[in-house]
Protein backbone atom coordinates (compact mmCIF):
# COMPACT_ATOMS: atom_id res chain seq x y z
CA UNK A 1 0.00 0.00 0.00
CA UNK A 2 1.02 3.59 -0.58
CA UNK A 3 1.43 4.28 3.14
CA UNK A 4 4.00 1.47 3.46
CA UNK A 5 5.82 1.84 0.14
CA UNK A 6 8.12 4.74 1.18
CA UNK A 7 9.47 2.69 4.08
CA UNK A 8 9.71 -0.91 2.90
CA UNK A 9 9.32 -2.96 -0.30
CA UNK A 10 5.94 -4.48 -1.06
CA UNK A 11 7.14 -8.00 -0.30
CA UNK A 12 7.71 -7.10 3.34
CA UNK A 13 4.03 -6.31 3.70
CA UNK A 14 3.09 -9.74 2.37
CA UNK A 15 5.49 -11.41 4.79
CA UNK A 16 4.00 -9.44 7.66
CA UNK A 17 0.48 -10.50 6.68
CA UNK A 18 1.48 -14.17 6.49
CA UNK A 19 2.93 -13.89 9.98
CA UNK A 20 -0.47 -12.86 11.30
CA UNK A 21 -2.48 -15.42 9.31
CA UNK A 22 -0.38 -18.34 10.56
CA UNK A 23 0.65 -16.93 13.96
CA UNK A 24 4.38 -17.23 13.24
CA UNK A 25 7.28 -15.79 15.16
CA UNK A 26 10.06 -14.01 13.26
CA UNK A 27 12.36 -17.09 13.19
CA UNK A 28 9.45 -19.32 12.14
CA UNK A 29 8.56 -16.91 9.34
CA UNK A 30 12.15 -16.98 8.10
CA UNK A 31 12.09 -20.79 8.06
CA UNK A 32 8.77 -20.82 6.22
CA UNK A 33 10.17 -18.59 3.47
CA UNK A 34 13.07 -20.98 2.98
CA UNK A 35 11.03 -24.19 3.07
CA UNK A 36 7.64 -23.31 1.50
CA UNK A 37 7.72 -22.00 -2.12
CA UNK A 38 4.12 -20.64 -1.97
CA UNK A 39 5.19 -18.29 0.81
CA UNK A 40 8.03 -16.95 -1.33
CA UNK A 41 5.66 -16.57 -4.27
CA UNK A 42 3.22 -14.53 -2.21
CA UNK A 43 6.03 -12.27 -0.99
CA UNK A 44 7.23 -11.77 -4.57
CA UNK A 45 10.54 -13.53 -3.91
CA UNK A 46 10.35 -15.93 -6.82
CA UNK A 47 13.60 -15.11 -8.63
CA UNK A 48 16.87 -16.93 -8.16
CA UNK A 49 18.58 -13.66 -7.32
CA UNK A 50 16.02 -12.61 -4.71
CA UNK A 51 17.49 -12.50 -1.24
CA UNK A 52 15.22 -13.89 1.45
CA UNK A 53 14.88 -11.64 4.50
CA UNK A 54 16.12 -13.01 7.79
CA UNK A 55 14.31 -12.73 11.11
CA UNK A 56 16.02 -9.42 11.93
CA UNK A 57 14.77 -7.84 8.71
CA UNK A 58 11.27 -9.13 9.41
CA UNK A 59 11.43 -7.63 12.90
CA UNK A 60 12.53 -4.26 11.53
CA UNK A 61 9.41 -4.04 9.39
CA UNK A 62 7.28 -4.47 12.52
CA UNK A 63 9.23 -1.62 14.10
CA UNK A 64 8.62 0.55 11.03
CA UNK A 65 4.87 -0.04 11.29
CA UNK A 66 4.97 0.93 14.94
CA UNK A 67 7.26 3.96 14.70
CA UNK A 68 5.43 5.58 11.78
CA UNK A 69 1.96 4.47 12.95
CA UNK A 70 1.31 2.79 9.62
CA UNK A 71 -0.91 -0.04 10.88
CA UNK A 72 -3.86 2.31 11.66
CA UNK A 73 -3.39 3.90 8.24
CA UNK A 74 -3.59 0.50 6.57
CA UNK A 75 -6.80 -0.28 8.48
CA UNK A 76 -8.32 3.04 7.38
CA UNK A 77 -7.26 2.46 3.77
CA UNK A 78 -8.95 -0.95 3.71
CA UNK A 79 -12.10 0.44 5.35
CA UNK A 80 -12.25 3.26 2.80
CA UNK A 81 -11.92 0.69 0.02
CA UNK A 82 -14.73 -1.45 1.46
CA UNK A 83 -16.92 1.62 1.84
CA UNK A 84 -16.20 2.63 -1.75
CA UNK A 85 -17.30 -0.86 -2.80
CA UNK A 86 -20.65 -0.35 -1.08
CA UNK A 87 -20.15 -1.62 2.47
CA UNK A 88 -21.75 0.72 5.01
CA UNK A 89 -19.26 1.74 7.69
CA UNK A 90 -20.48 5.21 8.68
CA UNK A 91 -23.86 4.42 10.23
CA UNK A 92 -24.20 3.47 13.89
CA UNK A 93 -21.35 1.98 15.91
CA UNK A 94 -21.24 -1.07 18.16
CA UNK A 95 -18.39 -1.07 20.69
CA UNK A 96 -16.89 -3.95 22.62
CA UNK A 97 -13.74 -4.98 24.45
CA UNK A 98 -12.03 -8.32 24.88
CA UNK A 99 -9.22 -9.46 27.16
CA UNK A 100 -5.97 -10.78 25.67
CA UNK A 101 -3.81 -12.72 28.11
CA UNK A 102 -0.16 -11.87 28.76
CA UNK A 103 2.53 -14.03 30.41
CA UNK A 104 2.58 -13.74 34.17
CA UNK A 105 5.80 -13.04 36.05
CA UNK A 106 6.33 -16.76 36.70
CA UNK A 107 6.11 -17.72 33.02
CA UNK A 108 7.94 -14.74 31.54
CA UNK A 109 11.45 -15.50 30.29
CA UNK A 110 12.87 -12.50 32.16
CA UNK A 111 10.87 -13.20 35.31
CA UNK A 112 9.32 -9.73 35.12
CA UNK A 113 5.85 -8.50 34.27
CA UNK A 114 5.19 -6.18 31.39
CA UNK A 115 4.59 -2.89 33.25
CA UNK A 116 1.93 -1.86 30.72
CA UNK A 117 -0.30 -4.89 31.32
CA UNK A 118 -2.45 -5.19 34.42
CA UNK A 119 -4.80 -7.72 36.06
CA UNK A 120 -8.52 -7.52 35.36
CA UNK A 121 -11.48 -9.33 36.85
CA UNK A 122 -14.22 -10.76 34.63
CA UNK A 123 -16.98 -12.37 36.63
CA UNK A 124 -15.23 -14.34 39.35
CA UNK A 125 -12.10 -14.94 37.28
CA UNK A 126 -8.95 -12.81 37.28
CA UNK A 127 -6.95 -12.28 34.09
CA UNK A 128 -3.59 -10.66 33.45
CA UNK A 129 -3.02 -8.89 30.14
CA UNK A 130 -4.39 -6.13 27.93
CA UNK A 131 -7.80 -5.14 26.61
CA UNK A 132 -8.67 -4.74 22.96
CA UNK A 133 -11.40 -2.14 22.40
CA UNK A 134 -13.06 -2.06 18.97
CA UNK A 135 -15.83 -0.19 17.20
CA UNK A 136 -17.76 -1.77 14.31
CA UNK A 137 -20.57 -0.56 12.07
CA UNK A 138 -24.11 -1.67 12.91
CA UNK A 139 -24.95 -2.47 9.27
CA UNK A 140 -21.84 -4.57 8.64
CA UNK A 141 -19.08 -6.37 10.51
CA UNK A 142 -15.77 -4.62 9.64
CA UNK A 143 -13.91 -2.82 12.42
CA UNK A 144 -13.26 0.89 11.95
CA UNK A 145 -11.56 1.77 15.28
CA UNK A 146 -9.09 -0.18 17.45
CA UNK A 147 -7.69 0.80 20.85
CA UNK A 148 -5.32 -1.14 23.08
CA UNK A 149 -5.17 -0.56 26.84
CA UNK A 150 -4.08 -2.28 30.04
CA UNK A 151 -6.40 -4.94 31.34
CA UNK A 152 -7.57 -2.81 34.26
CA UNK A 153 -9.02 -0.01 32.09
CA UNK A 154 -12.81 0.05 32.40
CA UNK A 155 -14.94 -0.56 29.31
CA UNK A 156 -16.75 2.76 29.63
CA UNK A 157 -13.48 4.72 29.73
CA UNK A 158 -12.78 3.95 26.06
CA UNK A 159 -16.36 3.76 24.77
CA UNK A 160 -16.52 7.27 23.28
CA UNK A 161 -13.06 7.01 21.72
CA UNK A 162 -14.33 4.13 19.57
CA UNK A 163 -16.81 6.29 17.66
CA UNK A 164 -15.88 7.54 14.19
CA UNK A 165 -17.76 10.83 14.62
CA UNK A 166 -20.49 10.50 12.00
CA UNK A 167 -22.89 8.17 13.80
CA UNK A 168 -26.03 9.14 15.68
CA UNK A 169 -26.53 5.78 17.44
CA UNK A 170 -24.07 3.76 19.50
CA UNK A 171 -24.52 0.32 21.08
CA UNK A 172 -22.71 -1.46 23.86
CA UNK A 173 -23.08 -4.00 26.67
CA UNK A 174 -23.88 -3.20 30.29
CA UNK A 175 -20.24 -2.49 31.11
CA UNK A 176 -20.52 0.84 29.27
CA UNK A 177 -23.30 2.25 31.44
CA UNK A 178 -22.96 6.03 31.65
CA UNK A 179 -20.95 6.45 28.42
CA UNK A 180 -23.25 9.22 27.20
CA UNK A 181 -22.71 11.25 30.39
CA UNK A 182 -18.92 11.23 30.43
CA UNK A 183 -16.88 14.39 29.68
CA UNK A 184 -15.68 12.92 26.37
CA UNK A 185 -19.22 12.07 25.20
CA UNK A 186 -19.92 13.26 21.66
CA UNK A 187 -23.00 15.45 21.09
CA UNK A 188 -25.76 14.05 18.94
CA UNK A 189 -24.96 10.41 19.73
CA UNK A 190 -27.58 8.32 21.52
CA UNK A 191 -26.21 5.38 23.46
CA UNK A 192 -28.22 2.14 23.48
CA UNK A 193 -26.65 0.22 26.35
CA UNK A 194 -27.79 -3.14 27.63
CA UNK A 195 -29.59 -3.34 30.95
CA UNK A 196 -27.56 -4.72 33.80
CA UNK A 197 -28.14 -8.48 34.24
CA UNK A 198 -29.44 -8.05 37.79
CA UNK A 199 -32.12 -5.59 36.72
CA UNK A 200 -33.17 -7.68 33.76
CA UNK A 201 -33.71 -10.71 35.98
CA UNK A 202 -36.21 -8.70 37.98
CA UNK A 203 -38.43 -8.11 34.94
CA UNK A 204 -41.76 -9.93 34.83
CA UNK A 205 -42.60 -10.01 31.09
CA UNK A 206 -45.43 -12.52 31.50
CA UNK A 207 -47.64 -10.42 33.79
CA UNK A 208 -46.54 -6.86 33.02
CA UNK A 209 -46.89 -5.63 29.41
CA UNK A 210 -44.48 -2.72 29.88
CA UNK A 211 -41.77 -5.02 31.19
CA UNK A 212 -42.50 -7.38 28.31
CA UNK A 213 -41.70 -4.55 25.89
CA UNK A 214 -38.56 -3.75 27.87
CA UNK A 215 -37.44 -7.37 27.66
CA UNK A 216 -38.07 -7.44 23.90
CA UNK A 217 -36.07 -4.22 23.52
CA UNK A 218 -33.15 -5.87 25.30
CA UNK A 219 -33.35 -8.77 22.85
CA UNK A 220 -33.16 -6.35 19.93
CA UNK A 221 -30.15 -4.65 21.49
CA UNK A 222 -28.44 -8.02 21.90
CA UNK A 223 -29.02 -8.93 18.25
CA UNK A 224 -27.47 -5.66 17.10
CA UNK A 225 -24.51 -6.03 19.48
CA UNK A 226 -23.83 -9.59 18.31
CA UNK A 227 -22.02 -8.35 15.20
CA UNK A 228 -19.19 -6.90 17.25
CA UNK A 229 -18.23 -10.41 18.39
CA UNK A 230 -17.45 -11.62 14.86
CA UNK A 231 -14.10 -9.83 14.34
CA UNK A 232 -12.72 -11.24 17.60
CA UNK A 233 -13.87 -14.69 16.54
CA UNK A 234 -11.79 -14.33 13.38
CA UNK A 235 -8.54 -13.14 14.96
CA UNK A 236 -8.64 -15.44 17.99
CA UNK A 237 -9.52 -19.01 16.91
CA UNK A 238 -8.80 -18.58 13.18
CA UNK A 239 -5.67 -16.42 13.21
CA UNK A 240 -4.56 -17.85 16.56
CA UNK A 241 -4.20 -14.57 18.46
CA UNK A 242 -4.89 -15.91 21.95
CA UNK A 243 -2.05 -14.19 23.84
CA UNK A 244 -0.08 -10.99 23.48
CA UNK A 245 3.16 -11.46 21.56
CA UNK A 246 5.18 -8.38 22.54
CA UNK A 247 6.01 -6.27 25.56
CA UNK A 248 4.39 -2.86 25.52
CA UNK A 249 0.98 -1.65 24.40
CA UNK A 250 2.31 0.17 21.33
CA UNK A 251 3.68 -2.98 19.69
CA UNK A 252 0.65 -5.09 20.55
CA UNK A 253 -1.81 -2.41 19.41
CA UNK A 254 0.01 -2.10 16.08
CA UNK A 255 -0.34 -5.85 15.63
CA UNK A 256 -4.04 -5.64 16.50
CA UNK A 257 -4.59 -3.08 13.75
CA UNK A 258 -3.05 -5.52 11.27
CA UNK A 259 -5.16 -8.38 12.61
CA UNK A 260 -8.40 -6.45 12.23
CA UNK A 261 -7.40 -5.22 8.77
CA UNK A 262 -7.08 -8.83 7.63
CA UNK A 263 -10.24 -9.80 9.51
CA UNK A 264 -12.16 -7.04 7.72
CA UNK A 265 -11.10 -8.44 4.36
CA UNK A 266 -12.03 -11.95 5.46
CA UNK A 267 -15.49 -10.89 6.64
CA UNK A 268 -16.09 -8.80 3.51
CA UNK A 269 -15.74 -11.97 1.42
CA UNK A 270 -19.44 -12.78 1.82
CA UNK A 271 -20.38 -9.32 0.56
CA UNK A 272 -18.08 -9.10 -2.46
CA UNK A 273 -17.16 -11.78 -4.97
CA UNK A 274 -13.46 -12.51 -4.98
CA UNK A 275 -12.68 -10.80 -1.67
CA UNK A 276 -11.44 -14.08 -0.21
CA UNK A 277 -8.67 -14.11 -2.79
CA UNK A 278 -7.48 -10.82 -1.34
CA UNK A 279 -7.15 -12.39 2.10
CA UNK A 280 -5.31 -15.54 1.15
CA UNK A 281 -4.11 -15.77 -2.46
CA UNK A 282 -4.34 -18.99 -4.44
CA UNK A 283 -0.62 -19.62 -4.13
CA UNK A 284 -1.00 -20.20 -0.38
CA UNK A 285 -3.82 -22.69 -0.90
CA UNK A 286 -1.41 -24.99 -2.70
CA UNK A 287 1.22 -24.92 0.01
CA UNK A 288 0.70 -28.61 0.70
CA UNK A 289 2.25 -30.03 3.85
CA UNK A 290 4.49 -27.28 5.27
CA UNK A 291 7.64 -27.88 7.26
CA UNK A 292 6.27 -26.25 10.41
CA UNK A 293 3.63 -27.72 12.68
CA UNK A 294 1.77 -24.41 12.78
CA UNK A 295 1.30 -24.47 8.99
CA UNK A 296 -1.00 -27.42 8.50
CA UNK A 297 -3.24 -27.39 5.39
CA UNK A 298 -6.32 -27.28 7.62
CA UNK A 299 -4.97 -24.27 9.50
CA UNK A 300 -4.13 -22.60 6.21
CA UNK A 301 -7.68 -23.16 4.97
CA UNK A 302 -9.27 -21.89 8.17
CA UNK A 303 -7.10 -18.80 8.46
CA UNK A 304 -8.19 -17.21 5.22
CA UNK A 305 -10.46 -19.32 3.08
CA UNK A 306 -13.19 -19.74 5.67
Label each region the model flagged.
Residues 21-28, 142, 239-244, 264-277:
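Short helix-capping/linker segments at secondary-structure and domain boundaries
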Residues 1-17:
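Basic, short loop/linker segments at the boundary and entry of helix-turn-helix/winged-helix-like folds
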Amino acid sequence: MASVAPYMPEGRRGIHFMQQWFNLSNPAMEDALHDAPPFRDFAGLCGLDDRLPDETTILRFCHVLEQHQLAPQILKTVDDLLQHKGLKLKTGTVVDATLVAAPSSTKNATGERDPETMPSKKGNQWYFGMKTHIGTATDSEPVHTVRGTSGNVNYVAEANSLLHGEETEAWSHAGSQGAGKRPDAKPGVRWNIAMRPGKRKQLDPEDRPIEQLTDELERIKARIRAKVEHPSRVIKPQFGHLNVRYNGLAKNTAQLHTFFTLANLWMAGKHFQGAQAEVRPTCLKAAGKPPLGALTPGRCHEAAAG
